[in-house]
Structures are given as structure tokens and as C-alpha cells.
Amino acid sequence: MSSLQKRPGPGNSSQPTERPRKESILDLSRYQDQRIQATFTGGRQITGILKGFDQLMNLVLDDVEEQLRNPEDGKLTGAIRKLGLVVVRGTTLVLIAPMDGSEEIPNPFVQAE
């Protein structure tokens, strides 16, 4: 029998190769300890204080409140459900927005009835 030798190449390296660290798409560090709003796939919305995040956009939020929607038409009801400390998975996020320094405006593309 012949002995097999490892050849250098991808997957056969005995030493770990150093890769550049992946950066996050957004720099959320400036919103650390500030209240933000997050919208998820499916339309759910929460607000909370950003306590931590990683490069995959997973978030840790504290003092979280969910804005409840009407199940029939999907419009916000004005009711709020307190959730406390929440870990949000980055793959479910659609929108992240700071609460301070922003205001809601009417959609300019919707025709007035």
C-alpha cells in the first residue's frame, strides 16, 4: 500500500489562513444605547434601546415595545405590548431606524382620495 500525503491547497492546509474580518453593512455603534425602531418581514414593528449587535445584524434590544396591528387589515391599532429584553435575528429584519431625530411624514407617492 502506498501512503497518502496531504497536498497543500484549499481544505488541506495544516495552518489556519487568516481572512479579513467581515464588516457589518451598517455601523450601528452610533445608535448604541439609543432607542431604535425595527420592522420585520411580515410587518411586525418594535421599538427598543439598542444594547448590542454583531456583523450578521443580530440585535439585542432592551425595554422593547411591539406596536400591534389589526389582524384583518394590518393597520396599526395604537396598542402596545411590552416585551422587555429581546434578541432579534438579523435575517428577519427589513428596516432599522433611529427614533431620535426622525419624524413620520405622509407618503408622497400615495394619491389623496
From Swiss-Prot:
Pfam families, sorted: LSM
GO molecular function: poly(U) RNA binding; U2 snRNA binding
GO biological process assignments: mRNA cis splicing, via spliceosome; nuclear-transcribed mRNA catabolic process; rRNA processing; telomerase holoenzyme complex assembly; tRNA processing
Region Disordered: start-end pairs: 1-23
Residue ranges occupied by any Sm domain in the UniProt entry: 23-102
PROSITE patterns in the record: SM
SUPFAM superfamilies: Sm-like ribonucleoproteins (SSF50182)
Principal subcellular localisation of the protein: cytoplasm
GO cellular component terms listed in the entry, alphabetical order: catalytic step 2 spliceosome; cytosol; Lsm1-7-Pat1 complex; Lsm2-8 complex; nucleus; spliceosomal tri-snRNP complex; telomerase holoenzyme complex; U2 snRNP
Calcium listed as a keyword: no
Alphabetized UniProt keyword annotations: Cytoplasm, mRNA processing, mRNA splicing, Nucleus, Ribonucleoprotein, RNA-binding, rRNA processing, Spliceosome, tRNA processing
Chain intervals with Polar residues compositional bias: 1-17
Record family assignment: Belongs to the snRNP Sm proteins family.
Free-text function comment from the UniProt entry: Component of LSm protein complexes, which are involved in RNA processing and may function in a chaperone-like manner. Component of the cytoplasmic LSM1-LSM7 complex which is involved in mRNA degradation by activating the decapping step. The LSM1-LSM7 complex loads onto the 3'-end of single stranded RNA. Component of the nuclear LSM2-LSM8 complex, which is involved in spliceosome assembly. The LSM2-LSM8 complex plays a role in the biogenesis of the spliceosomal U4/U6-U5 tri-snRNP complex by accelerating prp24-mediated annealing of U4/U6 di-snRNA.
Complexes and interactors: Component of the heptameric LSM1-LSM7 complex that forms a seven-membered ring structure with a donut shape. The LSm subunits are arranged in the order lsm1, lsm2, lsm3, lsm6, lsm5, lsm7 and lsm4. Component of the heptameric LSM2-LSM8 complex that forms a seven-membered ring structure with a donut shape. The LSm subunits are arranged in the order lsm8, lsm2, lsm3, lsm6, lsm5, lsm7 and lsm4.
Protein known as: LSM complex subunit lsm7
Organism: Schizosaccharomyces pombe (strain 972 / ATCC 24843) (Fission yeast)
Gene: lsm7
